[in-house]
Amino acid sequence: MKRFLAVCACLLALVLLYLFLADKTGLYIDWNPGRETTSFTRVEGKTILVDGEPFEIRGVDMGVGIPGHFATDYAIDRETYLRWFGQIQEMGANCIRVYTILQDDFYEAFYEYNKDREEPLYLLHGLWVNDYVMYSHRDAFDPEYLGALIEDGRTLIDILHGNKTFSLSEDLGSGAYTRDISPWVLGYILGVEWEDTTVAYTDHMQKEKNSYQGEYLFTSEDASPFEAMLAQMGDRLISYETRKYHAQRLVAFANWPTTDPFDWEEQVSAYFRKFAKVDVEHIRSTEKFLSGQFVSYHIYPYFPDYLGFQDVLGQEVPQKYRFMENGVFNSYRAYLSMINDYHTMPVVVSEYGVPAARGRAQTDRNTGRSQGGMSEKEQAEAAVSCYEDIMKAGCAGSVLFTWQDEWFKRTWNTMAYSDLTKTPYWCDVQTNEQHFGILAFDPGKERCVSYVDGDMEEWENVPAVVEQDGLTLQALYDEAYLTLRIHKEGYRFGEDTLYVPLDVTPRSGSKTAVEQDRKPAYERQGSESAASEEGTIVPLTFERPADFLLVLDGRDNSRVLVQERYEALRAVYSHLVYAEDAYLNPPAVDATAFVPIRLMLQVPLNPGPELENFGYDIAETFDTGLLRYGNGNPSSPDYDSLADFCVNGDDIEIRLPWLLLNFSNPSEMMVHDDYYLHYGVEEMPIEGIYVGAASEKSVRKDVQMAYLPLKGWGSQPTFHERLREGYYALQRLWTEP
């Protein structure tokens, strides 16, 4: 009996050892070594073939975000995926692209959706690089970098073949993966937008590792160490899938303009800090790799616009005449053509598009396809024109970024203003990265609490906050906006000016207001200071110290101003925008100056003055406090997603984004504390704000300000899905003859 137990224990130990080695090293036993290796995808010249027929990839990127959750929560369920797959295919797309290993619900849903479908929805699957490793001290040959990529790649291959009984990871999705979805997987996009410093550091530290000779991939004599690392990773994964599953599929390595293969003019390289290259032409395939490689790039029209930069500085752009449309230089199509002409393999633009967001991070100098500040209609038009540019450049396919909005995302020019641990719980229309989706998540279970559309029905049972001088103010709020309704007897839009002071923080504010315009450095001349010498005195005083002043002054001149002490841009970016140290001479707590609310942009439209007059970056800004007139109801035929206010007779509706009012986390009603007490942005809780309203012609010049209690919703935001115009625009393009 003891011998039997000992034998059983040894067998169990061997099984456990095999399972461990299979999981950690990819060890496996091929029980059918003579089986032929097959592939339903191939490359022929610059064309992708599926089942032997030319195939244009028309795809949509799909993230993992859903309101109330971070990406690593992997909170999207099977039923949601099934619904989305149907909507995507009905749009005319034939492919989705995901970036990393997801929860098992995704693969279950993908199998369920495709198993009996004559025309399947295909998949391009990504392989993610851990953020900590990417931005750490390691080069790409470090076991924590290359080793982790290969290990995760083997796990991914097993998952796609339904052969991963259980997978558990700190950063990746987990679960039981038993569905074989490999018949519908076109290929892999390995890696991410490579960090240029990692590429350069690897090439510097590992100079002797600049070649690789594998069974399926090898490098040319011109390869860099980083490219050799990519070849090794790709070869190891192709080998694993070939030997274990006797299958192959397309392979691409992620890339973007920051590490494109070109040598740019010295001024371009210096301005955009372009110092690293990844050239996949240096990675070659052997005859054993049946599927072949394609090229993957993320390319957006607004940044980094190398060719547009050259053009605006008067530098020669080769064959510029080919890309002139109605007198406008289409630098986006010119760059796409450069990329496609350079490569010998099929080129797929695996990210393109623009966000339908109120906030902006970069303006497109040529074709108006900017990173934010775009309405949903403009987003749709940009998606179509970008797709057409990609196809005219000769690319083999495209993948739109992205399917759904992602509230957890951050943008470099607003992230200092928000609590980044709470972003999934509210909708920040100032942060453009959250709103690339053609599927929007709007606040409210079925509809928003209020729309700025001139329909006052939703205000019927809302109590008044302020009543004075024939003027009434009411307020509602949700996960995206604080919405106000002002009723004024005999209101004359365009003639009467209304003022709405708001007291958000008890730390600062002023009872009087002088409207001033702090000039950014790029608008100043000589030794002119940032503060303008003259200002417009507001003909009212406020009952309480106000931090913001809403000025309703007609269709094109209505705006929100911020008291100088509470200007977030000054506190965070003064050195880049105003060329001044914000903390050497801070504004007084009760400073009377109220200034425009601006967002910093990445690159000026015309960088010439910056290059000529300054020895450092001087940022251009975007006036985000300027209010846009229009109808903000998606059900209306004249819907404008950027509409801030609407007027109907004696009634005005205004919606104010939370971040515009310095709320860092409205889900818990947290606002910015005094910047100059903390040397930066710190939070403080509030339970409400004070708000008032008056006309410049009011008899009473001391504006009454009443208390508006505010209560957060915690980590349980409400939302409903809505397909944006971009969905229907692409559907018309892709499905109609």
Model-predicted regions and their roles:
Residues G26-D116:
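Active-site-adjacent substrate/metal-binding segments within catalytic domains
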Residues A148-R154, Y201-A228, F309-E325, R360-M374:
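A solvent-exposed, charged loop/short amphipathic helix patch at secondary-structure junctions
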Residues V465-L611, P666-S698:
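Surface-exposed, glycine/proline- and aromatic-rich loop segments on solvent-exposed faces
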Residues Q267, F272-N366:
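Glycoside hydrolase catalytic-domain groove-lining segments
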Residues G454, Y481-E489, D650-W658:
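Short, well-ordered beta-strand segments enriched in hydrophobic/aromatic residues
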Residues N130-Y135, D139-D142, D152-S224, Y245-P257:
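Active-site groove signature of glycoside hydrolases
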Residues R360-R369, G373-E378, D389-V465, L723-E725, ...:
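Aromatic-rich peripheral "rim/lid" segments of glycoside hydrolase catalytic domains that contact
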